[in-house]
From Swiss-Prot:
Family of the protein in this entry: Belongs to the SGT1 family.
UniProt GO MF annotations: protein-folding chaperone binding
Keyword Repeat belongs to the record: yes
Gene Ontology cellular-component terms listed: cytoplasm; cytosol; nucleus; SCF ubiquitin ligase complex
Record's protein name: Protein SGT1 homolog B
Organism lineage string: Eukaryota, Viridiplantae, Streptophyta, Embryophyta, Tracheophyta
Domain CS: residue ranges: 157-246
Subcellular location: Cytoplasm; Nucleus
Protein species of origin: Arabidopsis thaliana
Gene Ontology biological process terms in this record: auxin-activated signaling pathway; defense response to fungus; embryo development ending in seed dormancy; innate immune response; jasmonic acid mediated signaling pathway; negative regulation of seed germination; protein catabolic process; regulation of defense response to fungus
Length: 358
C-alpha cells in the first residue's frame, strides 16, 4: 500500500501537482516510516513549493535512515542553497559526492557554493581608505598627528529571516522567529499593506512593513505564532500570480475587491503603540496607481481582474478551477465545460510544455 501511494505521488509530481505529491508521500511515510526514499522524494516535492525548511528536515531523516542514499544529500544541498546556507549545503553535497562520485550535479553545485561563500567573505572585508596625494607645499602628517580613519561597519543582517510562497488564492509569509511569545507579535493588514512588529526583550524591535505586490482582503487574512516561526496568510483580492511579495514600480497592481461596506470595516485591536493612519497609506497607494500606465502583462492582468470582479458565482468557479489545474495556462469562464473534468495545461502557440525533471 505504501509503495502504491508513493507511485501515485510520483505521478502527481510529474504532473506538477506538488502539493498533492507532498500529501501522498506523507501518507506513504505514515505506513512505512523507515523508508528513506519516501523522505528524500517528499523533500524534492517540498522544494518545488518553496518549503525549504521542511525539505531539509526530510533530507536529514532520509540520510539518517540510509546514509548512502545520494539523492538525499542532493535534496539537502539544494534546500540549504535556497535558504542561503551555503556552508551547510556544501558539506552535504561533498558527502553526497563521496557516495556517488560519478554524479556531475554534485560538483556543479559545490562550485556554486564556493562562489557564494567567496562573495559573502568578500562583503565582510573592510575597505582601506584611499591614500592622499603628496604635495610639495603641504608637510605630511606623522602617524601620531593623523586622525583615526573610521572603518565602515558591515550592514547589519535582519534579526529574523523571512520567505514567501503563494497559491492561487493566497500568499503565505513565514518569519523564522523561534520561541517568541504571542503577545510580543503584532500583525496588521491593510488593503495593500502588511505590518509586522516583533518585540524581543533586550533587542531592537523587528519590523516588516512592505507594500504588497497585490491587494488583499484584510478580513480574511490571519496569522499564527508557532514555536519556530510566525506564519502569515494573506487572502488575495484576485486570483493572480504575484511576481514578488513587495510591490515594485512597473509591476501590476490589482483593483480593490468588490466587497460590501460592512466587510470592508477593519477590526481595531487594543494596542499601546501609536495608531497607524491606514487611510492615509491607502490614499498614497491609490494615487500611485492612478499615475501609472498599465501595458503588457499589467494591462492583461487588470483585464482579467475586471472580468472576475463582475462575474457570477459559476464564472468565478470556472476561472479558479481552470487557472489552478492548468498551472496558469488556461482561464475559462464556462463552468459547464470545466466543472466535470480536469483542465490540462495548454502552452501558448509556439511554445512547448515541459515537465519538471524528477
Amino acid at each position: 500500500m505504501a509503495k502504491e501511494l508513493a507511485e501515485k505521488a510520483k505521478e502527481a509530481f510529474l504532473d506538477d501537482d506538488f502539493d498533492v505529491a507532498v500529501d501522498l508521500y506523507s501518507k506513504a511515510i505514515d505506513l512505512d516510516p523507515n523508508c528513506a526514499a519516501f523522505f528524500a522524494d517528499r523533500a524534492q516535492a517540498n522544494i518545488k513549493i518553496d518549503n525549504f525548511t521542511e525539505a531539509v528536515v526530510d533530507a536529514n531523516k532520509a540520510i539518517e535512515l540510509e546514509p548512502t542514499l545520494a539523492k538525499a544529500y542532493l535534496r539537502k544541498g539544494t534546500a540549504c542553497m535556497k535558504l542561503e546556507e551555503y556552508s551547510t549545503a556544501k558539506a552535504a553535497l561533498e558527502k553526497g559526492a563521496s557516495v556517488a562520485p560519478n554524479e556531475p550535479k554534485f560538483k556543479k553545485m559545490i562550485d556554486e557554493c564556493d562562489l557564494r561563500i567567496a562573495e559573502e567573505e568578500k562583503d565582510l572585508v573592510q575597505p582601506m581608505p584611499p591614500s592622499l596625494p603628496s604635495s610639495s607645499t603641504t608637510p605630511l602628517a606623522t602617524e601620531a598627528d593623523a586622525p583615526p580613519v573610521p572603518i565602515p561597519a558591515a550592514p547589519a543582517k535582519p534579526m529574523f529571516r523571512h520567505e514567501f510562497y503563494q497559491k492561487p488564492e493566497e500568499a503565505v509569509v513565514t518569519i523564522f522567529a523561534k520561541k517568541v511569545p504571542k503577545e510580543n507579535v503584532t500583525v496588521e493588514f491593510g488593503e495593500q499593506i502588511l505590518s509586522v512588529v516583533i518585540d524581543v526583550a533586550g533587542e531592537e524591535a523587528y519590523h516588516l512593513q512592505p507594500r504588497l505586490f497585490g491587494k488583499i482582503i484584510p478580513e480574511k487574512c490571519r496569522f499564527e505564532v508557532l514555536s519556530t516561526k510566525v506564519e502569515i496568510r494573506l487572502a488575495k483580492a484576485e486570483i493572480i500570480t504575484w511576481a514578488s511579495l513587495e510591490y515594485g514600480k512597473g509591476q501590476s497592481v490589482l483593483p480593490k475587491p468588490n466587497v460590501s461596506s460592512a466587510l470592508s470595516q477593519r477590526p481595531v485591536y487594543p494596542s499601546s503603540k501609536p495608531a497607524k493612519d491606514w487611510d492615509k497609506l491607502e490614499a498614497e497607494v491609490k494615487k500611485q496607481e492612478k499615475d501609472e500606465k498599465l501595458d503588457g502583462d499589467a494591462a492583461m492582468n487588470k483585464f482579467f481582474s475586471d472580468i472576475y470582479s463582475s462575474a457570477d458565482e459559476d464564472m468565478r468557479r470556472a476561472m479558479n478551477k481552470s487557472f489552478a489545474e492548468s498551472n496558469g495556462t488556461v482561464l475559462s469562464t464556462n463552468w459547464k465545460e470545466v466543472g466535470t473534468k480536469k483542465v490540462e495545461s495548454t502552452p501558448p502557440d509556439g511554445m512547448e510544455l515541459k515537465k519538471w525533471e524528477y
